[in-house]
From Swiss-Prot:
SMART domains assigned to the protein according to its UniProt record, in alphabetical order: DSPc (SM00195)
The keyword Protein biosynthesis appears for this protein: no
Positions with biased composition (Polar residues): 251-262
Similarity remark: Belongs to the protein-tyrosine phosphatase family. Non-receptor class dual specificity subfamily.
Name of the protein described by the UniProt record: RNA/RNP complex-1-interacting phosphatase
Region called Disordered, residue ranges: 1-27, 205-262
Keywords: Hydrolase, Nucleus, Protein phosphatase, RNA-binding
Recorded name of the encoding gene: Dusp11
Principal location: nucleus
Active site residues according to the UniProt entry: 151 (phosphocysteine intermediate), 157 (proton donor/acceptor)
Molecular function as annotated in GO: phosphatase activity; polynucleotide 5'-phosphatase activity; protein tyrosine phosphatase activity; RNA binding
Binding site for substrate: 152-157
Subcellular location: Nucleus; Nucleus speckle
Entry function: Possesses RNA 5'-triphosphatase and diphosphatase activities, but displays a poor protein-tyrosine phosphatase activity. In addition, has phosphatase activity with ATP, ADP and O-methylfluorescein phosphate (in vitro). Binds to RNA. May participate in nuclear mRNA metabolism.
Length: 321
C-alpha cells in the first residue's frame, strides 16, 4: 500500500495541501507592518509639512487592539494635541480602501495622487505633488495650516516626495532634508533607492518647458476645490504607469482621450454644494472610487476647454521639478 493511502486516504494529500493556493486577504486586512510605525510625526520646522501613516476607518478596528486604532478622527486629535491645525491632506496610497473622504471634516482639503510603492515616483507624480503644495501655500499664506502627507506607513513615498520638494523648490541640501524628515517622522526612510535618488539627482530648472507642462495645467481648475464625484469601480487592470487621480474642474470641460472619453459638468462655485456628473476613469482596479473629493491631473495635452476663461500661468516655471 502506498504510504500516503494509510494516513491521508487516496492520493497524495500532503502534496495537495502544499500546492493549495494562498488564502486571499479580505478588503479589511490591516496593511503589512502598519502597526510598527508611529501614527503621526511632528511638524517639520520651517515648513508646513507633517507626515503620518494612513488612518484606517472604523471597519478595521475589529482587527486592532484599542491602543492600536488610528482613525481619521484620531489623526485630527493627535495634531490638535501638538497645537497645530491641518489644512490639506495629500494621499499617496495606491488604493482607496483605507478610509473615505466623508470621514474627513469639510474644512479639510484632500488630494489623491496614486503613487506606486517601492519604485521612484516619476516626473508626473513629482510635478503633481509640487503643484498641490505650491497652490495650497499660495492660498493659505495668511495662516499657518499644515499639509499632511501620507502613504501606507507615512515613510518612504511620503518622505521621498516631501524631501524632493524641499530639495528642488526650497533649495535644501539633500542630506539636510532627509535628516529633517527622519527626525520629525520618528522613523528613517528605509528604501535605499529613494535615498540614493534624493542624494544624486540633479535639481532641474523648468525653463522653456511651458508647452509640455502648462498645457496640462492651464485649463485645469483649482486643485484644492472641494468636489464630490460619482465614480463607480471598473474591473479593469490599471495601466502600468498610471499615476494620480483626475481633478474635477470648476467650469464645464470636455475631455476626450483615445482610451476614455468622458465629460465633467459645471460644479457649483459654492464649496458647500456638490453636484454629480460623469466622472474621470478610476485608478487601480478593484477599488471603490465612489468617494473622492479632489481629482488631479497634471499630464500634458490632456485638458481641452470650452467656454472657459483660462487662469494666468507664467510663461515658464521658475521653480524646480
Amino acid at each position: 500500500m502506498n504510504q500516503h493511502y494509510g494516513r491521508h486516504g487516496r492520493g497524495r494529500g500532503r502534496d495537495f495541501a502544499a500546492c493549495a493556493p494562498p488564502k486571499k486577504k479580505g478588503r479589511n486586512h490591516i496593511p503589512e507592518r502598519w502597526k510598527d510605525y508611529l501614527p503621526v510625526g511632528q511638524r517639520m520646522p520651517g515648513t508646513r509639512f507633517i507626515a503620518f501613516k494612513v488612518p484606517l476607518q472604523k471597519k478595521f478596528e475589529a482587527k486592532l487592539m484599542p491602543e492600536e486604532c488610528f482613525s481619521p478622527l484620531d489623526l485630527f486629535n493627535k495634531i490638535q494635541e501638538q497645537n497645530e491645525e491641518l489644512g490639506l491632506i495629500i494621499d499617496l496610497t495606491y488604493t482607496q480602501r483605507y478610509y473615505k473622504v466623508e470621514d474627513l471634516p469639510e474644512t479639510i482639503s484632500y488630494i489623491k495622487i496614486f503613487t506606486v510603492g517601492h519604485q521612484i515616483p516619476d516626473n508626473d507624480t513629482i510635478f503633481q505633488f509640487k503643484c498641490a503644495v505650491k497652490e495650497f501655500l499660495k492660498k493659505n499664506k495668511n495662516n499657518d495650516k499644515l499639509i499632511g502627507v501620507h502613504c501606507t506607513h507615512g515613510l518612504n513615498r511620503t518622505g521621498y516626495l516631501i524631501c524632493r520638494y524641499l530639495i528642488d523648490v526650497e533649495g535644501m541640501r539633500p542630506d539636510d532634508a532627509i535628516e529633517l524628515f527622519n527626525s520629525c517622522r520618528g522613523h528613517c526612510i528605509e528604501r535605499q533607492n529613494y535615498i540614493e535618488n534624493l542624494q544624486k539627482r540633479h535639481v532641474r530648472k523648468n525653463r522653456n518647458v511651458s508647452a509640455p507642462r502648462t498645457d496640462g495645467l492651464e485649463d485645469s481648475a483649482d486643485p484644492t476645490e472641494q468636489v464630490y464625484t460619482n465614480n463607480k469601480p471598473v474591473k479593469k487592470k490599471p495601466r502600468k504607469n498610471r499615476r494620480g487621480g483626475h481633478l474635477a474642474p470648476s467650469q464645464h470641460f470636455q475631455h476626450q482621450t483615445q482610451s476614455s472619453p468622458y465629460s465633467l459638468r459645471k460644479w457649483s462655485q459654492n464649496q458647500s454644494v456638490y453636484q454629480r456628473g460623469l466622472v474621470p476613469p478610476p485608478g487601480p482596479a478593484g477599488e471603490d472610487y465612489s468617494q473622492r473629493r479632489f481629482f488631479w491631473s497634471a499630464r500634458p495635452n490632456k485638458w481641452t476647454a470650452e467656454s472657459y476663461q483660462r487662469p494666468f500661468y507664467p510663461y515658464y516655471w521658475e521653480w524646480n521639478l
